[in-house]
Protein backbone atom coordinates (compact mmCIF):
# COMPACT_ATOMS: atom_id res chain seq x y z
CA UNK A 1 0.00 0.00 0.00
CA UNK A 2 1.37 3.39 -1.02
CA UNK A 3 -1.08 5.97 0.29
CA UNK A 4 -1.60 8.89 -2.07
CA UNK A 5 -4.51 10.62 -0.31
CA UNK A 6 -3.48 13.65 1.76
CA UNK A 7 -3.74 12.38 5.35
CA UNK A 8 -1.87 13.45 8.46
CA UNK A 9 -0.23 10.07 9.15
CA UNK A 10 0.65 8.31 5.91
CA UNK A 11 2.89 5.66 7.49
CA UNK A 12 0.22 4.61 9.98
CA UNK A 13 -2.38 4.24 7.23
CA UNK A 14 0.02 2.35 4.96
CA UNK A 15 0.94 -0.05 7.76
CA UNK A 16 -2.67 -0.67 8.79
CA UNK A 17 -3.96 -1.23 5.26
CA UNK A 18 -1.02 -3.51 4.43
CA UNK A 19 -1.80 -5.56 7.54
CA UNK A 20 -5.47 -5.71 6.54
CA UNK A 21 -4.54 -7.00 3.08
CA UNK A 22 -1.92 -9.49 4.24
CA UNK A 23 -4.26 -11.04 6.80
CA UNK A 24 -7.38 -11.17 4.61
CA UNK A 25 -6.22 -11.29 1.01
CA UNK A 26 -7.64 -14.69 0.07
CA UNK A 27 -11.10 -13.81 1.37
CA UNK A 28 -10.94 -10.36 -0.25
CA UNK A 29 -9.84 -11.74 -3.61
CA UNK A 30 -12.42 -14.54 -3.57
CA UNK A 31 -15.31 -12.14 -2.98
CA UNK A 32 -14.00 -9.54 -5.45
CA UNK A 33 -13.64 -12.28 -8.07
CA UNK A 34 -17.31 -13.18 -7.66
CA UNK A 35 -18.39 -9.56 -8.05
CA UNK A 36 -16.31 -9.21 -11.20
CA UNK A 37 -17.69 -12.35 -12.79
CA UNK A 38 -21.23 -11.25 -11.97
CA UNK A 39 -21.01 -7.94 -13.83
CA UNK A 40 -19.11 -9.54 -16.71
CA UNK A 41 -21.82 -12.17 -17.11
CA UNK A 42 -24.64 -9.65 -17.12
CA UNK A 43 -22.86 -7.37 -19.60
CA UNK A 44 -22.13 -10.22 -22.00
CA UNK A 45 -25.67 -11.57 -21.73
CA UNK A 46 -27.00 -8.16 -22.75
CA UNK A 47 -24.92 -8.21 -25.94
CA UNK A 48 -27.03 -11.03 -27.40
CA UNK A 49 -30.24 -10.86 -25.44
CA UNK A 50 -32.80 -13.29 -26.95
CA UNK A 51 -35.81 -11.13 -26.06
CA UNK A 52 -34.80 -7.58 -26.98
CA UNK A 53 -31.84 -6.84 -29.22
CA UNK A 54 -31.96 -3.15 -28.28
CA UNK A 55 -31.51 -3.72 -24.54
CA UNK A 56 -27.73 -3.32 -24.79
CA UNK A 57 -28.01 0.09 -26.43
CA UNK A 58 -30.85 1.30 -24.20
CA UNK A 59 -29.77 0.07 -20.79
CA UNK A 60 -26.08 -0.84 -21.05
CA UNK A 61 -24.81 2.51 -22.34
CA UNK A 62 -24.23 0.88 -25.74
CA UNK A 63 -20.97 -0.40 -24.28
CA UNK A 64 -19.62 3.01 -23.22
CA UNK A 65 -20.29 3.20 -19.49
CA UNK A 66 -17.82 6.06 -19.10
CA UNK A 67 -19.65 8.55 -21.29
CA UNK A 68 -23.22 7.26 -21.62
CA UNK A 69 -25.85 6.95 -18.91
CA UNK A 70 -27.79 3.74 -18.40
CA UNK A 71 -29.26 1.40 -15.82
CA UNK A 72 -26.22 -0.88 -15.85
CA UNK A 73 -23.85 2.04 -15.34
CA UNK A 74 -25.84 3.17 -12.32
CA UNK A 75 -26.07 -0.41 -11.03
CA UNK A 76 -22.28 -0.79 -10.95
CA UNK A 77 -22.19 1.33 -7.79
CA UNK A 78 -23.74 -1.60 -5.88
CA UNK A 79 -21.51 -4.64 -6.62
CA UNK A 80 -18.30 -2.70 -7.27
CA UNK A 81 -18.67 0.68 -5.55
CA UNK A 82 -20.31 -0.22 -2.24
CA UNK A 83 -19.70 -3.95 -2.02
CA UNK A 84 -16.47 -4.92 -3.78
CA UNK A 85 -14.75 -5.53 -0.45
CA UNK A 86 -16.25 -8.28 1.71
CA UNK A 87 -14.47 -6.61 4.65
CA UNK A 88 -15.05 -2.85 4.42
CA UNK A 89 -12.26 -0.41 5.20
CA UNK A 90 -13.83 0.64 8.49
CA UNK A 91 -12.39 1.07 11.98
CA UNK A 92 -13.20 -2.52 12.93
CA UNK A 93 -11.21 -3.95 10.02
CA UNK A 94 -8.32 -1.49 9.60
CA UNK A 95 -8.12 0.19 12.99
CA UNK A 96 -8.72 3.79 11.95
CA UNK A 97 -11.16 6.25 10.43
CA UNK A 98 -10.64 9.41 8.40
CA UNK A 99 -12.18 12.69 9.55
CA UNK A 100 -12.44 16.20 8.18
CA UNK A 101 -11.10 18.82 10.58
CA UNK A 102 -14.58 20.07 11.49
CA UNK A 103 -15.86 16.54 12.08
CA UNK A 104 -12.83 15.72 14.21
CA UNK A 105 -13.41 18.77 16.41
CA UNK A 106 -16.94 17.55 17.10
CA UNK A 107 -15.62 14.09 17.95
CA UNK A 108 -13.07 15.51 20.41
CA UNK A 109 -15.75 17.69 22.00
CA UNK A 110 -18.13 14.70 22.09
CA UNK A 111 -20.75 16.68 20.25
CA UNK A 112 -21.20 14.52 17.16
CA UNK A 113 -24.90 13.84 17.64
CA UNK A 114 -26.38 13.38 14.18
CA UNK A 115 -24.18 16.01 12.55
CA UNK A 116 -21.79 13.68 10.70
CA UNK A 117 -22.03 11.36 7.73
CA UNK A 118 -19.66 8.98 5.96
CA UNK A 119 -18.66 10.18 2.52
CA UNK A 120 -17.31 7.73 -0.04
CA UNK A 121 -14.38 9.89 -1.05
CA UNK A 122 -14.17 8.77 -4.68
CA UNK A 123 -17.89 8.25 -5.25
CA UNK A 124 -19.44 4.80 -5.50
CA UNK A 125 -20.68 5.16 -9.08
CA UNK A 126 -17.34 6.51 -10.29
CA UNK A 127 -15.46 3.69 -8.57
CA UNK A 128 -17.87 1.05 -9.88
CA UNK A 129 -17.52 2.30 -13.45
CA UNK A 130 -13.73 2.59 -13.11
CA UNK A 131 -13.39 -1.00 -11.91
CA UNK A 132 -15.68 -2.37 -14.61
CA UNK A 133 -13.82 -0.54 -17.39
CA UNK A 134 -10.45 -1.65 -16.00
CA UNK A 135 -11.71 -5.25 -15.97
CA UNK A 136 -13.13 -5.04 -19.48
CA UNK A 137 -10.01 -3.35 -20.88
CA UNK A 138 -7.83 -6.05 -19.32
CA UNK A 139 -9.59 -8.61 -21.51
CA UNK A 140 -11.64 -9.79 -18.51
CA UNK A 141 -8.43 -10.80 -16.74
CA UNK A 142 -9.81 -11.59 -13.28
CA UNK A 143 -6.44 -12.80 -12.00
CA UNK A 144 -4.82 -9.43 -12.76
CA UNK A 145 -7.73 -7.60 -11.15
CA UNK A 146 -7.63 -9.67 -7.96
CA UNK A 147 -3.90 -10.21 -7.54
CA UNK A 148 -2.50 -6.91 -8.82
CA UNK A 149 -5.14 -4.25 -9.28
CA UNK A 150 -7.07 -4.68 -6.03
CA UNK A 151 -4.18 -4.48 -3.51
CA UNK A 152 -2.82 -1.42 -5.29
CA UNK A 153 -6.13 0.45 -5.35
CA UNK A 154 -7.66 -0.15 -1.93
CA UNK A 155 -7.82 3.56 -1.15
CA UNK A 156 -10.59 3.93 -3.74
CA UNK A 157 -12.84 2.39 -1.10
CA UNK A 158 -12.02 4.80 1.73
CA UNK A 159 -14.74 6.77 3.45
CA UNK A 160 -14.34 9.97 5.46
CA UNK A 161 -16.47 11.27 8.31
CA UNK A 162 -17.51 14.80 7.42
CA UNK A 163 -20.22 17.22 8.48
CA UNK A 164 -23.58 16.67 6.84
CA UNK A 165 -23.38 20.31 5.77
CA UNK A 166 -20.05 19.55 4.06
CA UNK A 167 -21.56 16.53 2.34
CA UNK A 168 -24.52 18.11 0.58
CA UNK A 169 -26.26 21.41 0.03
CA UNK A 170 -28.86 22.28 2.65
CA UNK A 171 -30.83 24.48 0.23
CA UNK A 172 -30.54 25.99 -3.26
CA UNK A 173 -28.55 28.97 -1.98
CA UNK A 174 -26.03 26.86 -0.09
CA UNK A 175 -22.56 26.93 -1.64
CA UNK A 176 -21.37 23.98 0.43
CA UNK A 177 -21.64 20.33 -0.53
CA UNK A 178 -19.15 17.98 -2.17
CA UNK A 179 -19.47 18.20 -5.97
CA UNK A 180 -20.77 15.03 -7.63
CA UNK A 181 -19.55 13.79 -10.99
CA UNK A 182 -17.39 16.83 -11.71
CA UNK A 183 -13.90 15.51 -10.93
CA UNK A 184 -11.68 12.74 -12.24
CA UNK A 185 -10.41 10.05 -9.90
CA UNK A 186 -6.97 11.65 -10.15
CA UNK A 187 -8.41 14.98 -8.98
CA UNK A 188 -10.26 13.24 -6.18
CA UNK A 189 -7.03 11.53 -5.11
CA UNK A 190 -5.71 15.04 -4.45
CA UNK A 191 -9.02 15.83 -2.71
CA UNK A 192 -9.66 18.77 -5.00
CA UNK A 193 -13.42 18.24 -4.53
CA UNK A 194 -12.91 18.71 -0.78
CA UNK A 195 -10.64 21.73 -1.15
CA UNK A 196 -13.21 23.47 -3.35
CA UNK A 197 -15.72 23.57 -0.50
CA UNK A 198 -13.20 24.60 2.13
CA UNK A 199 -12.44 21.29 3.84
CA UNK A 200 -8.88 21.72 5.19
CA UNK A 201 -6.25 19.16 4.28
CA UNK A 202 -4.79 16.79 5.22
CA UNK A 203 -7.58 14.56 6.48
CA UNK A 204 -7.19 13.45 10.08
CA UNK A 205 -6.50 9.80 10.89
CA UNK A 206 -8.21 8.65 14.10
CA UNK A 207 -7.52 5.26 15.66
Outline where the language-model segments fall.
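Nuclease and nuclease-like effector domains acting on nucleic acids or nucleotide cofactors
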Residues: 1-113, 175, 185-206
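Residues that cap or delimit alpha-helices
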Residues: 25, 139-141, 163
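Histidine-centered nuclease catalytic patch
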Residues: 110-152
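"Short basic amphipathic alpha-helical interaction patches in structured regions
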Residues: 132-141, 175-185
Amino acid sequence: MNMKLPVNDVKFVNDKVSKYWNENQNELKAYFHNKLMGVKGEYQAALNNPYDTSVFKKHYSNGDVINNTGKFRSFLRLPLGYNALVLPLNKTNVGFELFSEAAYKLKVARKIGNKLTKDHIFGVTEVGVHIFVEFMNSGWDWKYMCDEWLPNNLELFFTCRILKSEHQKEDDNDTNGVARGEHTLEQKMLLEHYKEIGIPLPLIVVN
